[in-house]
Amino acid sequence: MTSYRKITSNIAGKLSLLETYLFYCLALCSDCYTMESYIKQDNLTNIYGIKKTDQIREWLHKFESLGLISIDKSDIYGQYGKFNRCSYQLDTEHYVLITNKLYDEPISKELKGFLILLKCKCLNGTNTTLYSQNRLAEELGLAKGLSLIHI
């Protein structure tokens, strides 16, 4: 298992901080080479740290509508009847590498989401960005003048 996950830089400006963190959690639950995941929404809810499966489902469909993931539903027949199984294929075109260690950092989900979005706007393979704070806020879809103190 690799210690990094590919996150498409196309999320910048399209997702909120919390949605970005969910996208990262989904990437953590995906195969590190194919970026395909078979995680159940209940399990993803537990990993994300909320109790609202409906919120997770809503965000997953938003990701799909933005072309960030594709969702494939298939019917599974088992001992207890029929149920749906979803698989998620994450887009990795124009990606950045995000360490798996970020998940365990003792910081808020919002700050983790911000750091992921910030990395999406860095120069290839670096932690350097040439944007001003206001321009960066525009690019990421955040309020101008947003600082880490507010997160």
Positions of predicted regions on the chain:
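Conserved small/polar residues in nucleotide/adenosyl-binding loops
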Residues: 149-151
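Short coil turns linking two alpha-helices in DNA-binding domains
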Residues: 51-52, 143-146
